[in-house]
């Protein structure tokens, strides 16, 4: 058996052996609310979970990213970043509803991206347990602010801090039956529409900001 085949076999065995822990982590994390820009509770949970699996040097940065540098030194370049985001699109700040039905888990944001965030942590745990020796350092990242008004806050902070040191970037998101290889970016604008306004009856005929906003949205789509 080649070295590659041997590692592959160890990975498969590890994943099967630790599947119950992986599922338990999903059940727990899925209940923790994490609207964009308010991922504090999940960040703390993820840091503690990684540390419980043997990770050292785990940090929560100013953007609420949870970062575990694996075999990364101050002089490490050519880094590989593996990310799963912690925020969900739902604004809830109370514990999220969760249920299991016919072998399936149901919870707000569980597929985007709670399950994958746990998968990233399990990858890190596997690297530690199997004492994997990568050719380059790896950043395991639970990033914040991926959804909506989060505006990629966590990723922007990561690139600000590590910049050109990162040569490979993998975002684990959505379903796992496809790979997107083209760069994906986003731009956001904050638009203010100012009109005369006034009372809908007494000032009838004045320009209405809502009308123009709706017209702009219709044009975009």
Q: What do the predicted segments below correspond to?
A:
Residues 13, 179, 198-204:
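A short glycine-threonine-serine/GTX helix/turn-capping micro-motif
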Residues 87-100, 166, 181-192:
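Acidic-glycine-rich active-site phosphate/pyrophosphate-binding loop
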